[in-house]
Amino acid sequence: MAQLRRTLPEYTDPITQDYTEHLVYRLSEFSELTDRRLEIALIDNKSVNAFAAPGGIVGINAGLIFHAETEGQLASVLSHELAHLSQRHFARRMQRQKDRSLANSLMILGSIALAGVTSNPNALLVGQQAITQQNLSFSRGDEQEADRIGFKNMVAAGFDPKSTSYMFEKLQSLSRLSGSNELEFLRSHPLTKNRIADAQSRAQGLEGKNYRNSLDYDLVRNRSIVHFSEVPRQAVTVFKKEVEVAKTKKKILDATYGLALAYSKDNKHSDALENMRNALNIDSENLILQIGLLELHIAAENFFEAEALASSLLSTNPNNYPITMLYNKVLMNKGDYELGEKILRELSLIRPKDPEVWYWLAEVQGLDKNVIGLHLSRAEYFFLNGAYETSIKHLRMAMDLTSNNFQLTESILNKIERSHKSIEALKSVS
């Protein structure tokens, strides 16, 4: 994961990260995975791509959320990737290679991810070697097995059986629009007529049920739409039209939320807050909407209102990821660094592998003059991002300040050793 973070731009939206993690974990409960310790990386790229790799790594382009029109369509892709993981297709593919070294494994993983980010086939060149298309693609048998298992698990999790075929149709449409620049997801997951026909056949006879399509997904998808909107005013126009034509409360709420976010991105904070309150009037219990109001208060620099709301939300949703991250912003603005450090330290125990948590913990510790804590948190941040030498530098600076704390010194020495081992592992595959 650290190697991926060194090359991929992360989509650092706590609300989307939190939603996606819950969805992946839910799907994993219905999968054949025996080890469900997963790390989910959201990648800030508009193209459609997702991948799973040994070590429980699940990479998802934010563009997949942008393009998947329903939660079921997103679930169909994620279930497919979890099936690849549970059936060890990536590992088996490596075993079929003559060179089964870690270097080749990292090359293939990096190529899949990097090509999806750049949308450029040349990105498949890693170092001095080109990974062939045969190496990048799953075999036909692997794809069929992942389709079958992924479909079964997706349906068991409560999603519409037609979601897979609908997503295939979406991918076909996007592929036609992309012209010669074939979608990266289709490079590594070739979409054949047989796969489409099989997906349609599996869905037959499984109709007539109220399937999952949560409001939360629609809201999260609108976040991606606004995020990728280069001209906020155009997004405002689009969502205004959606509000006008919406016929149901759910669609009105969904579009109104998107409109509020678009107004905020366009720095129309009064309009943004008005529309977010309108959305909350329809569903006052939805947590994403409540957090959305908090976000907009912060964007509008209404810090008094933001602090009261953040404190209230965190008291009823302790250690909630997006609420904690937003509350810390409010506390940093207020100068209450001690409380900011407290809530982020608690969150770091729950999310020890989240670089964003360590980054902001280091920031607030620095402001609070906690120099040892600052260096330790920065060391963790750099370690998680694969900058091992920089991590060691901060650990040594922390150790210089802890000469009388033998327990902490021992902990720091262990972390330095951890970084040295990671450096040696990289050298062995270079």
Regions found by a protein language model. Give the residues of each.
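Acidic/histidine metal-binding catalytic segments
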Residues: R36, M94-D99, P121-A123, G158-F168
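Active-site recognition of the HExxH zinc-binding catalytic motif
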Residues: I60, S76-H84, R88, A146
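Catalytic Zn2+-binding segment of zinc metalloproteases
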Residues: G72, L82-D99
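Short pre-active-site segment immediately N-terminal to the catalytic Zn-binding motif
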Residues: A62-S76, L136-G141
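Membrane-active amphipathic alpha-helices enriched in small hydrophobic residues
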Residues: L102-T118, N122-Q134
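Extracytoplasmic and endomembrane cell-envelope/extracellular-matrix remodeling and assembly machinery
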Residues: E10-T12, T132-S311, T316-N319, I343, ...
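Hydrophobic or amphipathic, alpha-helical segments that drive membrane association/targeting
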Residues: M1-F51, L174-S180, T237, L253, ...
